[in-house]
A protein has these predicted regions:
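Hydrophobic faces of well-ordered beta-strands that scaffold small-molecule active sites
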Residues: 5-10, 32-36, 58-62, 85-89, ...
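A C-terminal functional module that forms or caps the active site or interfaces directly
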Residues: 36, 40, 44, 158-207
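Active-site-proximal loop/turn and secondary-structure-junction residues that shape catalytic pockets
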Residues: 12-14, 38-42, 64-66, 93, ...
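Short, acidic/polar
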Residues: 13-25, 68-78, 137-147, 190-198
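Residue-level signature of catalytic and energy-coupling elements of molecular machines
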Residues: 8, 63, 148, 199
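Structural motif
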Residues: 28-29, 81-82, 151, 202-203
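Conserved alpha/beta-domain cores
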Residues: 10-52, 62, 68-71, 165-167
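Conserved anion-binding
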Residues: 2-4, 70-155, 159-164, 169-172, ...
Length: 208
């Protein structure tokens, strides 16, 4: 049976802490990877630290969102990082941008999976309307997932509440679910959170 994939969010700039996290989470019982966002990537020697990780599955969560040429150039600028398994871009950047990112990523490293972020888990239906959206989060996610599929991305990032909906649209794509919390955990600035069990039951390919 295929092991369920869990990415541990390394949302810190403390490299010693991350080393301890990696050491203490090594196990054959679970399929563990490590997610590095812009906080760590832009920190002093963050990129260098990531480049030196060996035999670890690295999820580079840069959430790129710009014009096609700029995003493509940004991907090309990290071509020296040969250990990246997953890379994120915002689907709101549009079809042309997604297509450009996919093309360049496969050119520099065929193993990279490009994931399209739909709606951040920090948004609720009420808060997303405050920035100009008129449709529900599920409707927005559905539309953006369809664009990501058209651009031939490898996967989608969405909250656990949209997974079942996207399984019907993107049945052969990876579906990565962030905003994972255990019952009773503080949710911080997150709005759409879910337990690991419920996310996997809904059909998530991996959780963060």
């Amino acid at each position: 049976m295929k092991k369920q994939k869990i990415f541990i969010a390394c949302d810190t700039t403390n490299q010693n802490l991350i080393k301890k996290i990696i050491t203490h989470t090594k196990t054959n019982k679970l399929n563990i990877g490590y997610k590095f966002g812009i906080e760590f990537f832009y920190s002093k020697n963050g990129r260098k630290f990531i480049s030196k990780l060996k035999n670890e599955e690295v999820f580079l969560d840069l959430k790129l969102n710009d014009i096609p040429n700029t995003c493509a150039a940004a991907i090309n600028a990290i071509k020296d990082l040969k250990n990246i398994s997953y890379l994120t871009v915002h689907t709101s950047g549009g079809y042309e941008m997604l297509k450009a990112v996919k093309k360049v990523s496969k050119k520099i490293n065929k193993k990279i999976k490009v994931l399209g972020i739909t709606v951040l888990t920090s948004f609720s239906n009420s808060s997303i309307k405050k920035i100009g959206y008129t449709k529900s989060i599920k409707d927005i996610v559905k539309k953006q997932a369809a664009i990501a599929k058209l651009a031939k991305l490898d996967g989608i990032v969405c909250s656990g509440y949209e997974v079942k909906l996207l399984k019907k649209i993107c049945n052969r794509m990876d579906i990565i679910t962030p905003g994972i919390r255990l019952k009773g955990d503080s949710i911080g600035d997150q709005k759409r959170v879910m337990t690991p069990k419920d996310a996997f039951m809904n059909g998530a390919t991996a959780i963060v």
